């Protein structure tokens, strides 16, 4: 090295010797360790100059040549490199090896006879005229390579590179190699020269070998290891530069890079160079006919070409060029192929357009046919060489004709087949349209309501699918869906009718509870007709609700068979049978005068009623006509200001039956008068059969002449009025606002609102004729009802023909259109029979309200629903009333062939046998039956006439004496059908007498009233009236009875003590104190006398009532209740809890059991009877919590009709479990308008008051709502199920109470849960007197929602939104903006806009479920609220309409455009009220992207 520095001071020169395992195949294996490749890559790194094969087996001549020069080392030449410190140096590279004789396979003899280990460690090398080594091919051809001699023929070695092969070498043991290397290292170490271990062939390295090599190096002092790969050119330069740093201590230490990291860098460098080279080739080479020589010359000077050739070599560069040429040629051929294939259909259309010519030809035969066509050469060219894409034809751009050999390819065959299909499609389009329709009709997968997207998958593989366009599919499918949906709905309606017993047993009302709806779905769930509407659940639920509405409120209009309802047919038949020209005018004058007439009671003291009546009359025309919706109505007003117990102030008179009542007040005293008058009016009719005053529509109005809407007094009156309206279940109207006019009590808009409500109630009434009193029996002897099923496959004309054509048939005196009079000989005398022909649904209500001596019930033998309705009807009929069953068949042949007809005939006969009724069948083919077939039945009726009449009279008396809340709540007792539209009977218009005896030992009503008067003078008078009113509704109140001859009862002290005890127990017992005075022409001996006036404990055998057995002889039959349990659930008026003593104790009596219902006598009736007592009758809002009973209490039974029916032993366990889980107290709770947490504990001045009282123009948002939403957005946006999961009721009540006391309540400090706050917020809206979305706006919203076009629909909804009252609009905007924000976090809280709308629409809209429109529009309401939440920016912030659900903005700008609507506020001169909940730092605004998550509907 010192000599090198003397020669060149500037550029240092280092001599490096590369050593490692060498020798024969025995020592080193079949290949070397890679010393030559390492030297080759370092000295000549270009890929073209790198050689993998360097042999050590040489001939004697090669060994003696100038390159080897009889030495066992190779001189690789001189290399100049710039090291890391940018200092250039020169290196002479020498490889120490051992050459093998190719003859003896022993090492060649050399001048140095030392072993390899010692020879490799030599530091002085000398060989005169030794040439630089390139590769094996150089040996023997030295003149063909550059000849460069080793400098001065000698070198002094400055350092050693010790190579270790870490690959899996063939026939080489790595451990032996390590031993060799260890010995070699020890020898090299003696020279004191730097040594670096080089691991070669790391690209094929074995992990263990590499680890062992590092272990070996660590065992030596300061021995560095470099992992290399000469083939991949990884770390080769690093190995030599590391050794140079060790040689020259003054140079910086080289960082040794691990192999895989260096390999990654090298691979990235090669990949970058390749990409640049490919780009260069694609830019230069555009034609697939280019060659490598010309292109390589063009790229010679390009750095991209040079870099890639340097790294990968010329051969790889050429390979990439050829790949590019091949790709260009392929693309060119494909372009030509596409042109030819595109022209091929045109050639087919021109040459073979006739389907008949080619219909059955294959492509091969069609090819021959093409050659015969005259214009063949115009479209095709026949090439001498094939295939066409391998010939020069591909470059013949001028000839666009199709190569004929293209017809042999698969795409050409497919085009030919497509041409055939096209021709066939044109021929068979009409046929396939019909085939598609038939396929839809026969496919079992096409079910009602299945969307087209789902149905398409079932017909995709059908042959005819390709023959129809999408629009044709959808048109056919839409029509087919309409047909099958209509059919499925009809079948489902028939299913509901087949389960008539279930619906009547459940005693459903206008708002069925969730439990009852669950039972209905559970019972019907397994029916195929129920499952058929699985995809139309909304429509199915609407049908169920519609059917429930029909069951609860049966009219001709709600009848499922409308307009073919039996009632309409019967009315038409009877009216056309008896109408006469001379009677037309009379008939018109006798028609119902109330059709276009409104009778309105106005109740208000101190002149309020009279003043309002005058104001309303001032708005009417001269003849008291009022215009509503363009139609003229006669308005009859009855102002009442005094004591309603007096006849002059009675709500109803013989000529006036009210349709509604306006209740006016302007002070606490006038409000107390209203409550007391309503109480008295209802109380006076509790015992009547036409107690419709109990359900009279009421409207409570606060009169405020001055229009002053401020002040504590007014707010207090409003709040009290709302509470009273809630208790009375009536409408409360806000006081008339200022600007109406001086002196006005109510504006015209409010009057129209009230009258419209009355019209709606009036239209829903289908009043059955009032019950005939006993005195009317002088007109007719028997009253028979004939029941027909609507929709049965027979004609009512044929059934009634024998009746109407009978000579004895006459028009009914009562003028009814559904009854006739018959005079028939029964026994020895003629009897006058009133025959009423009604549908079953009209007959249900008269089973209890009308005196009926017998029923003739028809049913169709081939219709299940017909017999099911008959069973449901008979369940509630008393077993003393004779029944005639009539089965209608299609003839004897049909009965034999039809299993259903045979089964239903058999069941009808069995029912008749079990109830001791009569049965007959009439073929519909021979409907001209004779009335004589009913004569045995008429005889049965005559025999039981007396006991039926006595039973009817007793039931009315017993019902009056045991009236409970059921009178008010039962859908049967309270149904409009049970009321009368005719004038009251004389007994009904008599003034009410004292209900209790004026006896000091008995509770006195007069005392109650005196107490009431004293309490009214105090501040709590109103609350006392309401509590008194509720208590009277919840206790038994006897009816007023008429005077009767004095009858003295012996009431012992024990009796009175029992009564006192009962009074202390809270049971109100009543004793009639007024004598029963007979009227003119009244014979007391003809009628049963109620005998339940004396209060006594009953024995097992008790006197119930007495029946006149023979009026001429004065004998009386006393009927006793032998088995009390038989009266359970009868609904026929519960037994009085008072024992009675007979008026005829000394007379002979006969014992008869008290009548029961047919359901108790017939096993085929009442199969769903166990459901009757499983629920508390009422709507969801009325049910309240389940009341649990003790087992022993349940075993003792329950007195009266509401006793629990025990489970049957053979009952279905699943059904029994349902009943047990849903079992409720059988006593019906008093109806409540809505559960309110404020009613139970305190009277709030904030909750449950009108919205206008809790907002101001400065603060348009209620402070409570603002606090709740701020709290929820700060802590609860990520709460799963927010608004769906209910909060704790007691905590919600506590929150509202605390806020009521302190409006500055901090929710965070109180540590309320998020669900509690959310529930309290919903409760605030639920308790508003009117919903946040006004009812009149709901109608407009529904109409706007019906618009099909989405954009037009949204604009229409926005216009309706502008009509909201200002207060409602601001709060609605605030709440919807908050819900929109909640929906943005649906991935966390799982509350999408759909889920939120399901939870909120009942709270915000509160629809009136007493109307069918509201019942069937629930899905519409929910969708409207969902749209408001989804499109909140559009509705409230003038933003564009957002994408529909499932869409996403296509760019960041699109997203941004949907985000900031909540944060942008318009610049105004005044502070604007809060428009939406402010964004919190924890929850930044997110894009308004709709979500498709689903959640269950849980309110």
From Swiss-Prot:
Residues 783-947 form the pG2 pseudoGTPase domain. Residues 1249-1436 form the Rho-GAP domain. Residues 1058-1089, 1124-1146, 1177-1207, 1446-1499 are annotated as: Disordered. Binding of acidic phospholipids inhibits the Rho GAP activity and promotes the Rac GAP activity. Disulfide bonds: none annotated. Changing residue 1236 to A: No effect on total phosphorylation levels. No effect on inhibition of phospholipid binding by PRKCA phosphorylation. Abolishes phosphorylation by PRKCA. Residues 592-767 form the pG1 pseudoGTPase domain. InterPro entries: FF_domain (IPR002713), FF_domain_sf (IPR036517), P-loop_NTPase (IPR027417), pG1 (IPR039007), Rho-GAP_domain (IPR051978), Rho_GTPase_activation_prot (IPR008936), RhoGAP-FF1 (IPR032835), RhoGAP_dom (IPR000198). Keywords: Cell membrane, Cell projection, Cytoplasm, Cytoskeleton, DNA-binding, GTP-binding, GTPase activation, Lipid-binding, Membrane, Nucleotide-binding, Nucleus, Phosphoprotein, Repeat, Repressor, Transcription, Transcription regulation. Residues 1448-1470, 1485-1499 have a biased composition (Low complexity). The record marks 1284 as: Arginine finger. One of its GO terms (cellular component) is ciliary basal body. Its main location: cytoplasm. It comes from the Eukaryota. Residues 270-327, 368-422, 429-483, 485-550 form the FF domain. One of its GO terms (biological process) is axon guidance. Residues 1124-1141 have a biased composition (Polar residues). Interacts with RASA1. Interacts with the general transcription factor GTF2I, the interaction sequesters GTF2I in the cytoplasm. N-terminal part (1-266) has GTPase activity. Required for proper cellular localization. Rho GTPase-activating protein (GAP). Binds several acidic phospholipids which inhibits the Rho GAP activity to promote the Rac GAP activity. This binding is inhibited by phosphorylation by PRKCA. Involved in cell differentiation as well as cell adhesion and migration, plays an important role in retinal tissue morphogenesis, neural tube fusion, midline fusion of the cerebral hemispheres and mammary gland branching morphogenesis. Transduces signals from p21-ras to the nucleus, acting via the ras GTPase-activating protein (GAP). This is Rho GTPase-activating protein 35. It comes from Homo sapiens (Human). The gene is ARHGAP35.
